[in-house]
């Protein structure tokens, strides 16, 4: 019985630490990180790939093992704490088509509920920078 109590205490400590002690090197915690993304418009002939700062990484979460009368708890995602917006101009757009593509730039990140106003909460994409049109690479300063 004493061994069971020791294991329970160890499990609780790991959960309180968000599992970061055991998985710190395998799963980077939520933080700003550089990523290459794509911008394109149906009306413009060129896709532009650019590097910006996004929020990415591991957020601790828990799933109830036993059925409960309570609703499931919220699952946290790595999302923007502070952000700014930047814009690029898509080249070659015909007159009357807005060539400006705006996107969020992560200044700081935190684990929280997903806000669809400025986040894609669908999980990681295999190739988020994939263009369907000919593309140019843009280097932002």
Swiss-Prot record:
Cystine connections: 30-78, 44-93, 47-131, 55-109, 59-111, 114-121
SMART domains given in the database record: GHB
Signal found in the keyword field: yes
A family per Pfam: Cys_knot
Record-level Gene Ontology MF annotations: hormone activity
Subcellular localization(s) per the UniProt record: Secreted
InterPro entries, per the entry: Cystine-knot_cytokine, Glyco_hormone_CN, Gonadotropin_bsu, Gonadotropin_bsu_CS
Entry GO terms, CC: cytoplasm; extracellular space
Glycosylated sites: 34
UniProt keyword annotations, A-Z: Disulfide bond, Glycoprotein, Hormone, Secreted, Signal
Signal sequence, renumbered to the chain: 1-22
Biological process terms in GO annotation: G protein-coupled receptor signaling pathway
Protein's UniProt keywords contain Acetylation: no
Entry superkingdom: Eukaryota
Subunit architecture: Heterodimer of a common alpha chain and a unique beta chain which confers biological specificity to thyrotropin, lutropin, follitropin and gonadotropin.
Family of this protein: Belongs to the glycoprotein hormones subunit beta family.
Record PANTHER family: GLYCOPROTEIN HORMONE BETA CHAIN, LUTROPIN SUBUNIT BETA
Task performed by this protein: Promotes spermatogenesis and ovulation by stimulating the testes and ovaries to synthesize steroids.
The protein's name in its UniProt record: Lutropin subunit beta
Source organism phylogeny: Eukaryota, Metazoa, Chordata, Craniata, Vertebrata
